[in-house]
Amino acid sequence: MIDYNIFATGSKGNAVVIDQKILIDCGVSFKALSKVYRALKLVLLTHIHSDHFQPTTLRLLAENRPTLRFACCAWLCKPLVDAGVPVSQIDVLEPGHMYGYGICNVRPDMVKHNVPNCAWKVWLPSGKLFYCTDMNNLNGITAPNYDLYMVEANYDDAEIQAKIAEKKLNGEYIYELGVLHNHMSLAKINDWLYANMGQNSAYIYMHCHQDKEDAT
């Protein structure tokens, strides 16, 4: 069984620790990770939005853990360096390729968002993990019979259409129109899960929609 600790998920921050050793996303303060950072071996990053990428936290992780590896795709290499993470601690990975870290194997896959973003497939001694948030769809991506899926289920179609109609009527700014283009609905992710899950698979809905104009 894969051990996980969700420190935050949603527009206010995202950070998940897997098997006490792997941090996926880093959208929280260093203080929030104070009890776990010493055991971390690997950080997997997805995209630049501040609820997933906190430069100060990343710099402090690198300073306090000089052997910690930071894995990302090319679009996050410069932001990591600008944050203060030494180049020697950064691994730039190519989407669609598997990489070995001893404690696990990982593979990033590009997904559609309003900035470059990736999902992570992680092969652990405890099982296979698929992690993805902030995506419009998972077209072309499969992860059959994984043990755990941690995936975005951002909104219910009927509820968000009702919010859009209400805001149109009131002449308000309709943030939800952007949500439709940049995030995954409950219905779409359920269809994808049903097509990929095995009999013993488990799933967790992540990054559920909050009715705030500053969500990302």
What are the residue ranges of the model-derived segments?
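Active-site metal-binding loops of divalent metal-dependent hydrolases
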Residues: 8-9, 26-28, 48, 75-76, ...
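Catalytic core of the metallo-beta-lactamase
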Residues: 15-16, 97-152, 156
